[in-house]
Structures are given as structure tokens and as C-alpha cells.
């Protein structure tokens, strides 16, 4: 079986390589000045002649006393790695990294190049140590080289993948979505690594370095307020490719049910927005991945999958959206089936929903608003015992949310003020119906935070804080 080739469908990346190809390096002069060793320079020169100038009869075969049919082996690659580790000439090193990329991309020489590293995996470590350095062009090309090798059978190396994820040069390029062309190359490389199940644990371990960027790319596709919105057109626009490969990377990682659960918990709002993207995109490949990610996060293998489904229903308004999608005439049979499966999952869970489920989903989202349960006295009398369960778990969660907003948030921001108002209202209801909950308020320090809000500039916050204080004091002195 031949080597796996990464097809880097990036015009920008290919243009960078084309420009490097067009610039000849004075290999002989560098050898004469002893900037490079003679063997390193002659090897690079001969390879350039064969791969770039397409002149098979040039010097490598004669200098190595080999036959005229050029073959890749240790005599070809070891001098290149040696040059990269010893030279201070950045143009030379960029050119050599590009020559290695030419070998790996070549139908004629690619298999032999990979075979050399498979027979001597230590050489991959040597190459890695001299890669991902220099300007952004060299970082991208050398990144392409090491990833092209790391995905090959016999060359899997989790430690090197972790080193790659810790490389600030590569991560900085990935995180800069203003430079979409170069960001795209890095996401493609990471996505290629994620195809290998063996690498997914270490990739997820470093998810904070790339997941926010992936969701920012997807957010730009759905946020009509952004001047930089990436419009879902019919063309193979770079923006569409960025969306697709960002989603593909997320999808590959959510095959692991633990990662799927953590993704929803850490990025709930972004997860819910996947349905928004399905609504506006006309690219079925984008829709298919969005729906597949949602299905994997709703799988019974995922811890708290029922909670995820409830969040989709209550916070993501998923059921009417999916019902609407099910009426579209998609050509992709797999997509139509996935939408049907998701619709069935949502409908089954919807039958079992209660107003308390709605309340908990809202509390979990940390985005409290004046939805019906908060102002329905019947809701509180019917469900007050739920707030006592598990050592007042839900009540403590409510107090923690209030404290987080008071101590760390912008208490004057419009949305923050609403969250504080609603949290105070709910605490009042609990205290009135469960006077013993005042002990929990005391022990958590929540009472002091409520008192502090008596001086808030917003009249509704002040009013709700006063109600809560009166409820606390009323029972304290009974």
C-alpha cells in the first residue's frame, strides 16, 4: 500500500511553494564560502535540479556514484536534515523544507521518501526538531512535512503531535483568523492528524488552543452583525472550506463520547448555534457535518446525553428548526436520514419535558431570563422539593451564578443585570418556601452578595435584592 498523501487544497499555500521554487539558491557559492558543507549543498542542488528544474541528468547520481535513475534514500535525505540543523541561512532552510515537501507530494518519489523515515523513525524526530521555526512560510511548509509523515503507518508518534500542539509559531498562525489563508492551512493539518484515532486524546488535551478559533470561524458564518461575515455561497470560497474543515475536525473529535460531553459543557452556546448554520448554509457538506456532530453529542454513549437533548429543545429551539429542515429537498440521502433521526430523538424527549427541565436547562446555560417558570407561583410550589435534593445542589448552583456575576461580571451590562434580577427573584422564592435554605446562603456567603446589591444603580436589581433581604430577615427573626 502506498504512502498517504495530504492534498493541501490551498491556493495560497501552493503559491508560497511556487514562489520558493522560482528562486534559485547559489548552492555552489554557499559551499565555497563554507556556509554549507559540500555534501549538503551538492545534495540540495541536485534535488532542486531534479524536482524543480526537472533535469534528471544533473549531479546527484554522479556525485554519489549511483546509476542515472535517481532514487530517494539516506544519501538524499540525511544531508538535507543535516543542513537544516546546521545552517543559519533562512532562505536555504526554507528552500530545503520545500524540497522535502516536493518529495512527499511526488507521485514518483513520495513512497520512497516515506519508506526512508519508516525504516529509520529517529530521522522523523530529527526533522521535527529543525521544523516549525523561521518565518510563517517556513513554519507552514515544515508543518506540512512533519504532519505528512506523522499520518503514515509506522510513523505514528503521539509525543511529536503534542510537541506540535505546543509550538507557538504554528498555533499563533492557526489562531489568527484575520489571515484566513494561513489559518486554513493549520486547521487542515490539525484535521489530518485527528483522522488518526491514536492522536485524538492528545489533540483534545490542547483543545483550548484551537476550539475557540474553530467556533469563531463558524460564528462569522452565522452572525449577520459582523462586517466580516462569511457568506455561504455556491462557490468553493475559502470561507466555506474553513467552515467545512473546522466542522470536520470537531466531528472527528466527538467520536469520543467523553470529548463530546465536554464540548457541549464548555461550548454550549456555540454548539447550539450549529443549527443556525444549517439553516443558512446551502452547502450540504456543511449541513451534514453540523447534524452529525449534534447526533454524536446526543448519543446514548455520551454522559448526560439527555441533558444535551433538553438543552437543544429548550435553549436552541431545535424542534421547529429540525422540522423545517426535514421538509427541505436535500440530495444527500445520508443527510436526510440524519435529520430524520435527530427529529425523532427530539420529539421523544419533548414528550417527557417538564417546566423544571426548562428551568434547569436555563440555569445550566447561565443565561437566566424572565421566562415563565420564574414568575409562576405554581411552578415554585410544585417543584420546591427539587431545590433541596443532593444537599441543595440546584439552590447552590443558583447562588454560585449570582456570586459569579456580582464578583466577576460587569454588573451594569444589560444582560448581566437581567441575570442578577432573575437570580435574586428565584432565591426569594426558595427562601420563602424553604426557610432552612437560609443556612445555605449563610455558609456560601450568598447573603452578603445580596446585601451588596441593595446599593445597585439599577432599580429592578435593587428591588429584587430588597425582596430577597426581606425574605431572609423575616425568617431569621421569626
From Swiss-Prot:
Tagged with keyword Ion transport: yes
Record keywords: Hydrogen ion transport, Ion transport, Membrane, Transport, Vacuole
GO terms (BP aspect): endosomal lumen acidification; Golgi lumen acidification; proton transmembrane transport; vacuolar acidification
Membrane association type: Peripheral membrane protein
GO MF annotations, alphabetized: proton-transporting ATPase activity, rotational mechanism
Pfam families: V-ATPase_H_C (PF11698), V-ATPase_H_N (PF03224)
Main location: membrane
Chain segments annotated as transmembrane: none
Gene3D superfamilies: Leucine-rich Repeat Variant (1.25.10.10), V-type ATPase, subunit H, C-terminal domain (1.25.40.150)
Disruption phenotype: Increases the ATPase activity of membrane-detached V-ATPase V1. Abolishes growth at pH 7.5 and in the presence of calcium chloride, abrogates growth at pH 5.0.
Subcellular location: Vacuole membrane
GO cellular component: fungal-type vacuole membrane; Golgi membrane; proton-transporting V-type ATPase complex; vacuolar proton-transporting V-type ATPase complex; vacuolar proton-transporting V-type ATPase, V1 domain
Similarity remark: Belongs to the V-ATPase H subunit family.
Role: Subunit of the V1 complex of vacuolar(H+)-ATPase (V-ATPase), a multisubunit enzyme composed of a peripheral complex (V1) that hydrolyzes ATP and a membrane integral complex (V0) that translocates protons. V-ATPase is responsible for acidifying and maintaining the pH of intracellular compartments. This subunit is essential for activity, but not assembly, of the enzyme complex. This subunit is also required for silencing the ATPase activity of V-ATPase when V1 is detached from V0.
Record note on quaternary structure: V-ATPase is a heteromultimeric enzyme composed of a peripheral catalytic V1 complex (components A to H) attached to an integral membrane V0 proton pore complex (components: a, c, c', c'', d, e, f and VOA1). Interacts with YND1.
Note: Present with 22500 molecules/cell in log phase SD medium.
Protein name as it appears in the record: V-type proton ATPase subunit H
UniProt organism field: Saccharomyces cerevisiae (strain ATCC 204508 / S288c)
Amino acid at each position: 500500500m502506498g504512502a498517504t498523501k495530504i492534498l493541501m487544497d490551498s491556493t495560497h499555500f501552493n503559491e508560497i511553494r511556487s514562489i520558493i521554487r522560482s528562486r534559485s539558491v547559489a548552492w555552489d557559492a554557499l559551499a565555497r564560502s563554507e556556509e554549507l558543507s559540500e555534501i549538503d549543498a551538492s545534495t540540495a542542488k541536485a534535488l532542486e535540479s531534479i524536482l524543480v528544474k526537472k533535469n534528471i541528468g544533473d549531479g546527484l547520481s554522479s556525485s554519489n556514484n549511483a546509476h542515472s535513475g535517481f532514487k530517494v534514500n539516506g544519501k538524499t535525505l540525511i544531508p538535507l536534515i543535516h543542513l537544516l540543523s546546521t545552517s543559519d541561512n533562512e532562505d536555504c532552510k526554507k528552500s530545503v523544507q520545500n524540497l522535502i515537501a516536493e518529495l512527499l507530494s511526488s507521485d514518483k518519489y513520495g513512497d520512497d521518501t516515506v519508506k526512508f523515515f519508516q525504516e529509520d523513525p529517529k530521522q522523523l524526530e530529527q526533522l521535527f526538531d529543525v521544523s516549525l521555526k523561521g518565518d510563517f512560510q517556513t513554519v507552514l511548509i515544515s508543518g506540512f512535512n512533519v504532519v505528512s509523515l506523522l499520518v503514515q503507518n509506522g510513523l505514528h508518534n503521539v509525543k511529536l503531535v503534542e510537541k506540535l500542539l505546543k509550538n507557538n509559531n504554528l498555533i499563533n498562525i492557526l489562531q489568527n483568523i484575520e489571515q484566513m489563508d494561513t489559518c486554513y492551512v493549520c486547521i487542515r493539518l490539525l484535521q489530518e492528524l485527528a483522522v488518526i484515532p491514536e492522536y485524538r486524546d492528545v489533540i483534545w488535551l490542547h483543545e483550548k488552543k484551537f476550539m475557540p478559533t474553530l467556533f469563531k470561524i463558524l460564528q462569522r458564518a452565522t452572525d449577520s452583525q459582523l462586517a466580516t461575515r462569511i457568506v455561504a455561497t455556491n462557490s468553493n470560497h475559502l470561507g466555506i472550506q474553513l467552515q467545512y474543515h473546522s466542522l470536520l475536525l470537531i466531528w472527528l473529535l466527538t467520536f469520543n463520547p467523553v470529548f463530546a460531553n465536554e464540548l457541549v459543557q464548555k461550548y454550549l452556546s456555540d454548539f447550539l448555534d450549529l443549527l443556525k448554520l444549517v439553516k443558512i448554509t446551502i452547502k450540504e457538506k456543511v449541513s451534514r457535518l453540523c447534524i452529525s456532530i449534534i447526533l454524536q453529542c446526543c448519543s446514548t454513549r455520551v454522559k448526560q446525553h439527555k441533558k444535551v437533548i433538553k438543552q437543544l429543545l429548550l435553549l436552541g429551539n431545535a424542534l421547529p428548526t429540525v422540522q423545517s429542515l426535514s421538509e427541505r429537498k436535500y440530495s444527500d440521502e445520508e443527510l436526510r436520514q440524519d435529520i430524520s433521526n435527530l427529529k425523532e430523538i427530539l420529539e421523544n424527549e419533548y414528550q417527557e419535558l417538564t417546566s423544571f427541565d426548562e428551568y434547569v436547562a436555563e440555569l445550566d446555560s447561565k443565561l437566566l431570563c424572565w421566562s415563565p417558570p420564574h414568575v409562576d407561583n405554581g411552578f415554585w410550589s410544585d417543584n420546591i422539593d427539587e431545590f433541596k435534593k443532593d444537599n441543595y445542589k440546584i439552590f447552590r448552583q443558583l447562588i454560585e451564578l449570582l456570586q459569579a456575576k456580582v464578583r466577576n461580571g460587569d454588573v451594569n451590562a444589560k444582560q448581566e443585570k437581567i441575570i442578577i434580577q432573575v437570580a435574586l427573584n428565584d432565591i426569594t422564592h426558595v427562601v420563602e418556601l424553604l426557610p432552612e435554605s437560609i443556612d445555605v446562603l449563610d455558609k456560601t456567603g450568598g447573603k452578603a452578595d445580596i446585601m451588596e446589591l441593595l446599593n445597585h444603580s439599577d432599580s429592578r436589581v435593587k428591588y429584587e435584592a430588597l425582596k430577597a433581604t426581606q425574605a431572609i430577615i423575616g425568617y431569621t427573626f421569626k
